[in-house]
């Protein structure tokens, strides 16, 4: 089965073709970072218009690189939510329209299910069940995964997502957009121990997260200290350390609560090298395993949508002809396969 995947939930246009026997045949990605940089964040209207311009050319390029024609495809998968409603409607409209004109089945894919299943694209893919930490600019949640569609949310952010906290703190430090990766780069020059940030919501039971207070703590720390390069690096290190420690503490709790030994980390923040280092160390101590997507599949991409959509289409999940987008779509409302 060969599936065309389309991802347009935010500020990246992703298109890919996945074959259930040969694996990933092609993968195209266009980032809108430069388009939104002057605004310091994603402008929904600009994002939608750019998806309109880029999606069809990327589909043509993906087919060309895979050496395929539309007649060689078995289905189309598109991100239907959660995300920016205008951006989602672009991908959904194109996906449904092409499916109708090419005589193919189409399926709407949950964006976070795509992230959760992204490690399945790797040679060393995790077996079910596992605990998944989905950590990105828009979401931070802990999920117990028994199978595809069998998701129980164990905890989630009550305010800012981890990636959002990274970007907002980077902005406070005067770093360019998108600031999260730049803050992490600056933290590499930082000194451990000079500043101590709190580990929010780790002093009480539960698996929910809160990162807005860290942003406020960072703002106060920045104002109270000199603006030299080393101080900035030390603050960046302390902030990143606090976020990662908090995530690690919650992961350890989730694994203990569920009795599972496999941990999946996915979403944009899963590309963070310090996070990978610390959670890798944690799982070694716990005699467990940790799984990540390759770095290029941590951010939004069409490959994860093609893979997730393939699983749904194999299960005979088809959508009606209407074009629908779901800006808010709880992942635990998805249907398990074959149920």
UniProtKB/Swiss-Prot annotation:
* Subcellular location(s) of the protein: Cytoplasm
Q: Does the keyword Nuclease apply?
A: no
Catalyzed reaction equations:
L-threonylcarbamoyladenylate + adenosine(37) in tRNA = N(6)-L-threonylcarbamoyladenosine(37) in tRNA + AMP + H(+)
Binding sites annotated in the UniProt record for substrate: 134-138, 167, 180, 272
What's any one GO cellular component for it?
cytoplasm
EC code(s) of this entry: 2.3.1.234
UniProt GO BP: tRNA threonylcarbamoyladenosine modification
Q: Which HAMAP family match?
A: TsaD
What is this protein's function?
Answer: Required for the formation of a threonylcarbamoyl group on adenosine at position 37 (t(6)A37) in tRNAs that read codons beginning with adenine. Is involved in the transfer of the threonylcarbamoyl moiety of threonylcarbamoyl-AMP (TC-AMP) to the N6 group of A37, together with TsaE and TsaB. TsaD likely plays a direct catalytic role in this reaction.
Q: Which NCBIfam families match?
A: gcp_kae1, T6A_TsaD_YgjD
Q: Which PANTHER family match?
A: TRNA N6-ADENOSINE THREONYLCARBAMOYLTRANSFERASE (PTHR11735), TRNA N6-ADENOSINE THREONYLCARBAMOYLTRANSFERASE, MITOCHONDRIAL (PTHR11735:SF6)
What is the recorded name of this protein? tRNA N6-adenosine threonylcarbamoyltransferase
Organism listed in the record: Photobacterium profundum (strain SS9)
């Amino acid at each position: 089965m060969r599936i065309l995947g389309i991802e347009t939930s935010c500020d990246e246009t992703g298109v890919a073709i996945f074959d259930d026997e040969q694996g990933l045949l092609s993968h195209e990605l266009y980032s809108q970072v430069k388009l939104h940089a002057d605004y310091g964040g994603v402008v929904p209207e600009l994002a939608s218009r750019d998806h309109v311009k880029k999606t069809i050319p990327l589909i043509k390029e993906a087919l060309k690189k895979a050496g395929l024609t539309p007649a060689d495809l078995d289905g189309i998968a598109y991100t239907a939510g959660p995300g920016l409603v205008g951006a989602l409607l672009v991908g959904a409209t194109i996906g449904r329209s092409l499916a109708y004109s090419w005589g193919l089945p189409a399926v709407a894919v949950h964006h976070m299910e795509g992230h959760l299943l992204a490690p399945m694209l790797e040679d060393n893919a995790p077996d079910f069940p596992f605990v998944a930490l989905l950590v990105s600019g828009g979401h931070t949640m802990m999920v117990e995964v028994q199978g595809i569609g069998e998701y129980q949310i164990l905890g989630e952010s009550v305010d800012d997502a981890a990636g959002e906290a990274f970007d907002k703190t980077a902005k406070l430090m005067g770093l360019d957009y998108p600031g999260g990766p730049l803050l992490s780069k600056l933290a590499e020059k930082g000194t451990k121990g000079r500043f101590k940030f709190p580990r929010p919501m780790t002093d009480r039971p539960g698996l929910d997260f809160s990162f807005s207070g860290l942003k406020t703590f960072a703002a106060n720390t920045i104002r109270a200290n000199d603006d030299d390069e080393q101080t900035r690096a030390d603050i960046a290190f302390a902030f990143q350390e606090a976020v990662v420690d908090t995530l690690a503490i919650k992961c350890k709790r989730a694994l203990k609560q569920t009795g599972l030994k496999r941990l999946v980390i996915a979403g944009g923040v899963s590309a963070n090298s310090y996070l990978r280092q610390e959670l890798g160390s944690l799982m070694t101590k716990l005699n467990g395993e940790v799984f990540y997507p390759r770095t290029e599949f941590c951010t939004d991409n069409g490959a994860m949508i093609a893979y997730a959509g393939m699983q749904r289409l194999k299960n005979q999940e088809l959508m009606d002809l209407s074009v629908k987008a779901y800006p808010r779509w709880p992942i635990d409302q998805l249907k398990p396969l074959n149920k």
